[in-house]
């Protein structure tokens, strides 16, 4: 961080199992992990007021990603294809829905839906990555607010009629 000028920086860290001399799908016995990291500028945190909140345009799509989204991996082709569809429609994010028309997540974020005095967020399962920031938001909402938080399936109709939608991501 100091070498990159300190200040408001994000750090991307990726550690893989490593490489093998000959391509194979089985895990190697004694791999040497590959470690990759870099720092990048981020905006300072907002004060949380409506005047400084960031607004984004999002589109909705049927979730076409693979069925193991709860696994953190670099296999992001499905997410990338969804984002590219959003960009083609001049949107910054895409809200994804499963075959039952229930919200899964966004292509790069977890989702919170505000309806009346309730905050809804989908329950975790194989279709959703359990985000660190999502968990922290839930803990803070429970400890420091009077908001009613419901972790449960969230329908497309509930999303489309929401008064607010929050996205959380590290």
PLM features: what roles do these ranges have?
Residues 1, 8-23:
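Short, glycine/charge-rich beta-strand/loop segments that flank catalytic centers
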Residues 3, 21-170:
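Helix-start/capping segments and mature chain N-termini
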């Amino acid at each position: 961080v100091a070498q990159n000028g300190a200040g408001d920086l994000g750090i991307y860290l990726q550690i893989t199992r490593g490489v093998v001399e000959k391509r194979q799908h089985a895990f190697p016995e004694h791999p040497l992990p590959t470690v990759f990291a870099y720092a990048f500028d981020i905006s300072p945190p907002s004060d949380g007021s409506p005047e400084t909140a960031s607004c984004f345009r999002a589109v909705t799509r049927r979730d076409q990603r693979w069925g193991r989204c709860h696994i953190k991996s670099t296999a992001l082709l499905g997410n990338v294809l969804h984002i590219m569809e959003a960009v083609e429609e001049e949107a910054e994010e895409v809200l994804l829905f499963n075959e039952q028309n229930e919200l899964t997540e966004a292509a790069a974020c977890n989702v919170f839906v505000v309806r009346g005095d309730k905050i809804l967020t989908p329950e975790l399962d194989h279709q959703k990555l359990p985000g660190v920031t999502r968990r922290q938001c839930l803990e803070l909402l429970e400890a420091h607010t009077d908001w009613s938080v419901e972790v449960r399936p969230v329908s497309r109709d509930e999303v489309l009629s929401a008064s607010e939608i929050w996205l959380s991501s590290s």
